[in-house]
């Protein structure tokens, strides 16, 4: 049963095996984690901009074979709208702290009832109703 949605920064730590502790937690949670299609898009973008796109895209494909990639759904989009409106109403709209991609990932996690695993807890604390934790 899925419990966690991994943020892009955590995926990068796992792939690079740094720090080692994050890889250990990742291995213990096998079958309970997924990534958002938004995270996959961010990873693919980074790989395409890298000095060795074919190799880095292959690494991403290998990583994605180990867990589920959740499609971004209409339900997630509705959560995005709700979260964005709530942040704007509080006078803390999307800006220097939460990037639009991050907000989509947060909305996706919240819409699926999953805990977002991120190294940016401070960014995501503003999102109402979002469960989050850091494995570092």
Question: Language-model segments: which ranges?
Answer:
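Alpha-helix capping/helix-boundary segments
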Residues: 10-11, 39, 76, 122-123
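Short, structured coil segments at secondary-structure junctions
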Residues: 29, 65, 127-128
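Acidic, PIN/NYN-like endoribonuclease modules and their adjacent C-terminal/linker elements
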Residues: 106-136
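Active-site neighborhoods of divalent-metal-dependent phosphate/nucleic-acid chemistry enzymes
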Residues: 68-115
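Short, well-structured N-terminal submotif of metal-dependent ribonuclease cores
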Residues: 1-36, 45-62
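Generic structural signal for small/hydrophobic residues in well-ordered secondary structure
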Residues: 7-8, 43, 80, 109, ...
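Short, flexible helix/strand-to-coil boundary loops that buttress conserved ligand/catalytic motifs
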Residues: 15-18, 26, 47, 84, ...
